[in-house]
């Protein structure tokens, strides 16, 4: 499971002209799921995302988590995070999980985040053509892969 975590001052998701998510200070999390992903991957990423100290404290030192600053989270599914660009110029998405596996994993990921966070997680719509608007704060952008835990 791969995620891109972006610290934002504002973010929203629009599908077919309707806003499905809208936050101010918080995190925008893009998530890509592959067939080898398990609940263990979800649990590891959930703990990291909720506790990651990437918000400034009173001295503007990154010592605070999204919980500490009473921020919000938007999660957006993005199969293109598993693109392979090794061969040719057209990315291959063969490593991305098919919807029958990816949708339940995505839903479990969101539920796990909500449980750990103690707040509702806003989302896009899985598989939809989404317009994601964000104001990246910093910028602070973190890439994590549960299969390559660094």
Curated annotation (Swiss-Prot):
<comment type="function">
    <text>An aminoacyl-tRNA editing enzyme that deacylates mischarged D-aminoacyl-tRNAs. Also deacylates mischarged glycyl-tRNA(Ala), protecting cells against glycine mischarging by AlaRS. Acts via tRNA-based rather than protein-based catalysis; rejects L-amino acids rather than detecting D-amino acids in the active site. By recycling D-aminoacyl-tRNA to D-amino acids and free tRNA molecules, this enzyme counteracts the toxicity associated with the formation of D-aminoacyl-tRNA entities in vivo and helps enforce protein L-homochirality.</text>
</comment>
<dbReference type="InterPro" id="IPR023509">
    <property type="entry name" value="DTD-like_sf"/>
</dbReference>
<keyword id="KW-0694">RNA-binding</keyword>
<dbReference type="InterPro" id="IPR003732">
    <property type="entry name" value="Daa-tRNA_deacyls_DTD"/>
</dbReference>
<dbReference type="GO" id="GO:0000049">
    <property type="term" value="F:tRNA binding"/>
</dbReference>
<keyword id="KW-0963">Cytoplasm</keyword>
<comment type="similarity">
    <text>Belongs to the DTD family.</text>
</comment>
<dbReference type="GO" id="GO:0019478">
    <property type="term" value="P:D-amino acid catabolic process"/>
</dbReference>
<dbReference type="GO" id="GO:0043908">
    <property type="term" value="F:Ser(Gly)-tRNA(Ala) hydrolase activity"/>
</dbReference>
<protein>
    <recommendedName>
        <fullName>D-aminoacyl-tRNA deacylase</fullName>
        <ecNumber>3.1.1.96</ecNumber>
    </recommendedName>
</protein>
<dbReference type="Pfam" id="PF02580">
    <property type="entry name" value="Tyr_Deacylase"/>
</dbReference>
<dbReference type="GO" id="GO:0051500">
    <property type="term" value="F:D-tyrosyl-tRNA(Tyr) deacylase activity"/>
</dbReference>
<comment type="subunit">
    <text>Homodimer.</text>
</comment>
<feature type="short sequence motif" description="Gly-cisPro motif, important for rejection of L-amino acids">
    <location>
        <begin position="138"/>
        <end position="139"/>
    </location>
</feature>
<dbReference type="GO" id="GO:0005737">
    <property type="term" value="C:cytoplasm"/>
</dbReference>
<keyword id="KW-0378">Hydrolase</keyword>
<keyword id="KW-0820">tRNA-binding</keyword>
<dbReference type="GO" id="GO:0106026">
    <property type="term" value="F:Gly-tRNA(Ala) deacylase activity"/>
</dbReference>
